[in-house]
């Protein structure tokens, strides 16, 4: 197709665009500011004005309506894709049979769910699982949950960025070794959705309330994702991704177990280096000589080692030299990052907060929001303690600490160190800000007059 019409029009003229195969016009007129011949943008600095940007954005509200009855996203020549039949699920499953390695998990014949569902016309069962996890509330909340640092700096990892990096490592390995990429990605994205606020300290906090303790992997598969009706292979991989758990039932699940360890060892070190907690010169030579000192070098080497072992030996494992270097890196991180005195103090404060919240909401389930009285389908009336654990475990770091201030009346000094108090929204912060706008004894506005809305008043309103 060849675009043959004008691309800009004067004010009030609807642009008509014609190609050899389709004609269409904009859904509404839009205005183009008069142009200076020496400055076609109408701006002396060559940049469009704010009003121009707003008008152009508004003109795209409903897209470009084509004469053939379709709507185009861009006021430009359509990109032609002709002679294509939809690639349906059954055909893609057949492709898997010819592409994937022996022993890989095939989508066809797999994907048993607790509650049977009709198949999707285009997506495999594991692609549906991946999409459900990706769009879930539990996955989004990982953005507000600790990886290593409570309330990390902008460039430091959260549980969400960790999950994304695990998915990248795992799918790189799965693709190179002809395993099921969609299943691998689903397990990787969902593997940490059972974590509570404050990182692994939450497992210690919640463990005393539950028979058998609290394991984020098991909790994620059996509680958080229970209502999503995921495939048994996906749930198995999530439930058993930790090395202390039984071996996953699929090779894709084992790949995620390795990818999780590879990713967090490399990126936790990088975050600690940037935070000034450790220095490169502290790394043992047994690490740097084998896998390097940077995240990119470590990922490249360890992914290559895993792929190489799988393709040479036919088992999801790693040769000893690389595995020993990974183990040494993990030990270094434990000694210098995870168990440093500041980290232990932070974890202790997190445990105190979470235990107090569970006790509070198990004794007063009516104080939780209505939707939170049956978290993940658990009935607070039938089992108030387990329901309280589920409610608190679903909180982000920030929300849990707000609850401690608002519901428990805690002083901020009891919270984990490093928390940015102005970023929270507790009643304590509102009371503090009320002093800035006149305090509780500030005179009431005259009848018929609204109170002034200066910057401090607007700040207080935004915290409500």
Give the location of each predicted region.
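Histidine-centered, transition-metal-coordinating active-site segments
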Residues: 1-160, 170-173, 180-182, 202, ...
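Conserved catalytic Lys-bearing alpha helix of Rossmann-like short-chain dehydrogenase/reductases
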Residues: 163
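Aspartate-rich (DDxxD/NDxxD/DxxxD) Mg2+/diphosphate-binding motifs
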Residues: 183-209, 217
């Amino acid at each position: 197709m060849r675009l043959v019409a004008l691309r800009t029009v004067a004010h009030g003229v609807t642009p008509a665009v014609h190609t050899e195969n389709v004609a269409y016009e904009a859904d509404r007129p839009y205005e183009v500011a008069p142009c200076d011949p020496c400055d076609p943008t109408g701006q002396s600095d060559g940049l469009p004005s704010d009003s121009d940007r707003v008008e152009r954005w508004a003109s795209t509200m409903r897209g470009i309506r084509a004469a053939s009855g379709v709507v185009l996203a861009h006021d430009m020549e359509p990109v032609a894709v002709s002679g294509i039949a939809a690639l349906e699920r059954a055909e893609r499953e057949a492709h898997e049979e010819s592409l994937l390695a022996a022993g890989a998990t095939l989508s066809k014949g797999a994907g048993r769910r607790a509650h049977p569902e009709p198949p999707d016309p285009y997506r495999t069962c594991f692609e549906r699982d991946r999409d459900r996890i990706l769009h879930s509330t539990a996955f989004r909340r990982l953005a507000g949950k600790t990886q290593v640092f409570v309330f990390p700096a902008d460039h430091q990892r959260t549980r969400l960025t960790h999950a994304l990096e695990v998915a990248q490592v795992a799918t790189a390995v799965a693709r190179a070794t002809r395993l099921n990429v969609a299943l691998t990605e689903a397990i990787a994205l969902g593997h940490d959705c059972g974590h509570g606020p404050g990182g692994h300290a939450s497992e210690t906090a919640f463990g005393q309330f539950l028979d058998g303790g609290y394991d984020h992997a098991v909790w994620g598969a059996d509680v958080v994702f229970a209502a999503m009706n995921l495939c048994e292979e996906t749930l198995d991989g999530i439930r058993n991704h930790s090395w202390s758990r039984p071996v996953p039932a699929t090779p894709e699940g084992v790949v995620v177990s390795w990818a999780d360890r590879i990713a967090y060892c490399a990126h936790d070190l990088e975050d600690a280096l940037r935070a000034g907690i450790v220095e490169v010169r502290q790394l043992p030579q047994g690490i740097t000589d084998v896998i390097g000192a940077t995240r990119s070098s470590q990922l490249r080497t360890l992914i290559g080692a895993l792929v190489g072992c799988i393709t040479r030996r036919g088992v999801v494992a790693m040769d000893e030299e690389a595995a020993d270097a990974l183990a040494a890196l993990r030990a270094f991180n434990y000694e210098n990052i995870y168990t440093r005195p500041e980290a232990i103090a932070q974890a202790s404060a997190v445990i105190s907060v979470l235990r107090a919240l569970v006790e509070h909401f198990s004794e007063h389930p009516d104080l939780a929001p209505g939707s939170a009285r049956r978290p993940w389908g658990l009935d607070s009336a039938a089992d108030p303690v387990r329901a309280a654990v589920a409610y608190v475990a679903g909180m982000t770091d920030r929300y849990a600490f707000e609850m401690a201030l608002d519901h428990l009346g805690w002083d901020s000094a009891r919270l984990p160190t490093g928390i940015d108090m102005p970023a929270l929204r507790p009643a304590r912060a509102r009371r503090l800000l009320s002093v800035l706008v006149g305090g509780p004894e500030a005179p009431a506005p005259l009848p018929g007059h609204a109170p002034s809305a200066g910057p401090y008043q607007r700040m207080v309103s935004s915290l409500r």
